């Protein structure tokens, strides 16, 4: 990457402060752009779901991995819950969505409460592994909530065979004017697919481990037995290990990282597979160099740019994210490491600019919180708009969850030191209510950015990108108008 006219900025920059200049290009199609990463994680999209309790869980992890990204399970989740989640993610199908399934005697009320867990908006009625019918929200409208699903289900359903190719599945659903169908293998339900899902399976490549299973990562903090927890997570089968704290350039992190690295290396000697370590967060050269020297493969970059984070307003500490990513990526590349840009992502352009600055992948949190796949319950505001609650990982709410085993006095003391929002409404976009819808939007933007730069890969994109500086008026000029002026 270079700045337009070789200008060297005299101040630090956010994503809004910069733009990319189009260059001569031989890339004729967005689909000619390969967005696979080279940081050793194995993702085919440069998207990482942040290790936030309100964002990353089992549903999110399997859905994102199916499209090529990876989710990081938060460090606050008990290990037995993490183990169960990893097992279920690894068992999930790499192409077909996991169905929301109920028994024939399930009540309408319970079935309707389960539908928002997935974006396909239906449940499959199953008995002895075989689907009997489908229930949608329309089927349950104005029906007694204690009625049973077998009374209202649609038994005349289209069932697709696992061996069918995506195009034939799409055509079969289109002919029947359906958006959703169960997929069977030898008569047994193994998943469901939508028309969009059939299309996506021809565009995206899932992020899978050497055994062909969906990938998932997990985080550990720097307090407590980080070494022991890291070993447990590795044995569970995670695909990237994140060592995470808000201030990554501190002695405790630099003491913990070598311990985690040693556990990882011993695991690699035993299994033949070297799991990448990501650590952070930092915002400059010195922090990046120290983390790489201590044993990380990937440096997480960002202090305070996230929507749920109040660090900059509370402390004055942080750095505009574009400049932080640019400097850290330069230092990491010189040391043979990589960076993830963590925070401040609000539009597809921000993802593209982070990659142009040298990030291998981009971490997204709050933007993905407002989707069906995030862990929270779907709620409805007074205006009728559906939303999910989100909160920061240094907020009083997160601290309370993290310190549940401490005494009441200690928990009250720690709650005084919060840096994050404890409750924020993240509204579902009516046009993009599922995380896959957002992934479609992001990848379309990033692929198009690469074609403007004449790049076929992320590495070429970083090499060829030409970045200019703009005023706030310049940024506003590029915003679309949804009504006339």
Where are these regions (language model features)?
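Short beta-strand/loop segments at the ligand-binding rim of alpha/beta enzyme cores
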Residues: 43-49, 95-98, 210-219, 260-283, ...
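Glycine-rich phosphate-binding active-site loops on the catalytic face of alpha/beta enzymes
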Residues: 66-81, 238-250, 297-315, 345-378
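Short, ordered loop/turn segments at secondary-structure junctions
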Residues: 75-78, 128-129, 136-140, 165, ...
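Catalytic cores of alpha/beta
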Residues: 59-61, 227-236, 283-301, 341, ...
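Active-site-adjacent beta->alpha loops and helix N-cap segments on the catalytic face
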Residues: 29-31, 77-87, 146, 190-207, ...
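Bateman/CBS regulatory modules and CBS-like beta-alpha motifs in cytosolic regions of diverse proteins
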Residues: 24, 29-44, 48-52, 81-118, ...
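Alpha/beta catalytic cores of nucleotide-metabolism and tRNA/nucleoside-modifying enzymes
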Residues: 1-24, 102, 161, 171, ...
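Catalytic beta/alpha-barrel core
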Residues: 72-76, 101-102, 122-124, 159-161, ...
């Amino acid at each position: 990457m270079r700045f337009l006219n070789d200008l060297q900025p005299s101040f630090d920059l956010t994503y809004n402060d910069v733009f990319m200049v189009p260059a001569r290009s031989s890339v004729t199609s967005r689909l000619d752009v390969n967005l696979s990463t080279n940081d050793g994680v194995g993702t085919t999209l440069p998207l990482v779901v942040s290790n936030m309790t309100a964002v990353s869980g089992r549903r999110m992890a399997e859905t994102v991995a199916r499209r090529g990204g990876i989710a990081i399970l938060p460090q606050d989740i008990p290990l037995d819950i993490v183990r169960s989640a990893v097992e279920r993610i690894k068992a999930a199908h790499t192409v077909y969505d996991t169905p929301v399934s109920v028994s024939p005697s399930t009540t309408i009320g319970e079935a309707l409460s389960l539908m928002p867990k997935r974006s396909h908006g239906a449940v499959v009625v199953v008995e002895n592994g075989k689907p009997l019918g489908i229930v949608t929200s329309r089927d349950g409208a104005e029906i007694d909530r204690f009625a049973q699903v077998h009374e209202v289900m649609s038994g005349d359903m289209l069932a697709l065979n696992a061996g069918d190719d995506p195009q034939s599945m799409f055509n079969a659903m289109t002919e029947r004017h359906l958006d959703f169908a169960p997929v069977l293998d030898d008569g047994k339900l193994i998943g469901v697919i939508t028309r969009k899902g059939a299309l996506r399976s021809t565009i995206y490549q899932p992020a899978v481990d050497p055994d062909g299973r969906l990938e998932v990562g997990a985080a550990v903090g720097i307090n407590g037995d980080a070494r022991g927890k890291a070993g447990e997570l590795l044995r569970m089968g995670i695909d990237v290990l994140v060592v995470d704290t808000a201030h990554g350039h501190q002695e405790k992190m630099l003491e913990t990282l070598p311990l985690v690295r040693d556990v990882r290396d011993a695991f690699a000697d035993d299994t033949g597979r070297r799991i990448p370590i990501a650590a952070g967060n930092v915002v400059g050269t010195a922090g990046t160099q120290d983390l790489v020297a201590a044993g990380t493969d990937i440096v997480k970059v960002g202090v305070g740019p996230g929507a749920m984070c109040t660090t900059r307003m509370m402390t004055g500490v942080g750095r505009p994210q574009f400049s932080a990513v640019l400097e850290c990526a330069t230092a990491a590349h010189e040391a043979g490491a990589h960076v993830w840009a963590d925070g401040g992502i609000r539009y597809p352009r921000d993802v593209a600019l982070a990659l142009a600055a040298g990030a291998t992948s981009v971490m997204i949190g709050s933007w993905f919180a407002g989707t069906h796949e995030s862990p929270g319950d779907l709620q409805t505001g007074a205006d009728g708009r559906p939303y999910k609650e989100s909160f920061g990982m240094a907020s009083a709410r997160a601290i309370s969850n993290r310190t549940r085993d401490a005494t009441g006095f200690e928990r009250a003391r720690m709650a005084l030191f919060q840096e994050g929002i404890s409750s924020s409404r993240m509204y579902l976009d009516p046009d993009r209510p599922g995380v896959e819808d957002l992934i479609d939007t992001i990848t379309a933007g990033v692929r198009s950015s690469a074609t403007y730069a004449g790049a076929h890969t992320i590495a070429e994109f970083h090499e060829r990108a030409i970045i200019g500086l703009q005023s706030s008026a310049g940024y506003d000029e590029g915003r679309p108008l949804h009504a006339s002026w």
